[in-house]
Amino acid sequence: MPINRPNLNLNIPPLNIVAAYDGAEIPSTNKHLKNNFNSLHNQMRKMPVSHFKEALDVPDYSGMRQSGFFAMSQGFQLNNHGYDVFIHARRESPQSQGKFAGDKFHISVLRDMVPQAFQALSGLLFSEDSPVDKWKVTDMEKVVQQARVSLGAQFTLYIKPDQENSQYSASFLHKTRQFIECLESRLSENGVISGQCPESDVHPENWKYLSYRNELRSGRDGGEMQRQALREEPFYRLMTE
């Protein structure tokens, strides 16, 4: 399927996401979620089901791999170049106005089913209704078979607070929760087999494919203490309880 390729000489780097570090101060985003957890949770429970209009005429996985240094599709800037093993997608006009607070989801599928998984999810990932402004998918031709992002975590969705003060609104949290549930359902409906969940992540029993990590307050090595801390993250609880 087509990808628009403007003839522009733009220097657009891959996503720069803040690395995990020890002793990180709890940002105001997290404090807001903790202090307003019950109110946000109650508001979310009363909201109607969200609907996501799927984008049409989106690239397939092969097309994504061929996006090169710069391409456009459905308002998303795409790039896949150099030694980076990921194909990056970034919404040209972000819907979320806050600063990244570390919240992200991985999607893990069987290595050989990444193209099929992308085909199942692409209409949602490129949807104008999607709450996800930035995401990436592994270019499976660039990674060795036993690599972490080969066995699982082939998709990463970065979630940013929707408000300018870097706080999440109840409506955005509800929309995000509904969106990830929709991704789960779509993969299951299409017979996609789940992959290896990263040791660094947590997920409830009913999630077969998605998992969560806050990368400002955790590392890739994981461990039970880290997973317990992640299960207590207010953002994660609002997505799962």
UniProtKB/Swiss-Prot annotation:
Knockout phenotype, as recorded, reads: Strains lacking this gene are attenuated for systemic virulence in mice.
Xref: InterPro entries: OspF/SpvC (IPR003519), OspF/SpvC_sf (IPR038498)
Q: Which Gene3D superfamilies match?
A: phosphothreonine lyase
Which residues constitute the catalytic centre?
Answer: 106, 136
Q: From the Swiss-Prot or TrEMBL record, what is one GO molecular function term?
A: lyase activity
> Span of the secretion signal?
none
- Provide the E.C. number(s) assigned to this enzyme: 4.2.3.-
Record localization: Secreted
Gene Ontology cellular component list: extracellular region
Per the record, what is the consequence of mutating residue 160 to A?
More than 5-fold decrease in substrate affinity
Q: Does the keyword Metal-binding apply?
A: no
Query: What's the effect of swapping residue 201 to N?
Result: 47-fold decrease in enzymatic activity, but no effect on substrate affinity
Task: Report keywords, A-Z.
Answer: Lyase, Plasmid, Secreted, Virulence
Spell out the activity-pH relationship. Answer: Optimum pH is 8.5.
Q: What is the effect of changing residue 134 to R?
A: No effect on enzymatic activity
The entry's stated outcome for residue 90 to E is:
Slight decrease in enzymatic activity
Quote the annotated effect of residue 86 to D. Answer: Marked decrease in enzymatic activity
In the record, the effect of residue 215 to A is given as: Nearly no decrease in enzymatic activity
Effect of altering residue 100 to E?
Marked decrease in enzymatic activity
Q: What class of enzyme is it?
A: lyase
The record's similarity note reads: Belongs to the phosphothreonine lyase family.
Query: What's the stated role of this polypeptide?
Result: Secreted effector that irreversibly inactivates host MAP kinases by catalyzing the dephosphorylation of the phosphothreonine residue in the pT-X-pY motif in MAPK2/ERK2, MAPK3/ERK1, and p38, via a beta-elimination reaction leading to a dehydrobutyrine residue. Is also able to remove the phosphate group from phospho-JNK in vitro, but JNK may not be a substrate in vivo. Could help suppress localized pro-inflammatory responses at infection foci in the spleen and liver, and thereby facilitate bacterial growth.
Q: What is this protein called?
A: MAPK phosphothreonine lyase
Starting at the broadest rank, the lineage of the source organism is:
Bacteria, Pseudomonadati, Pseudomonadota, Gammaproteobacteria, Enterobacterales
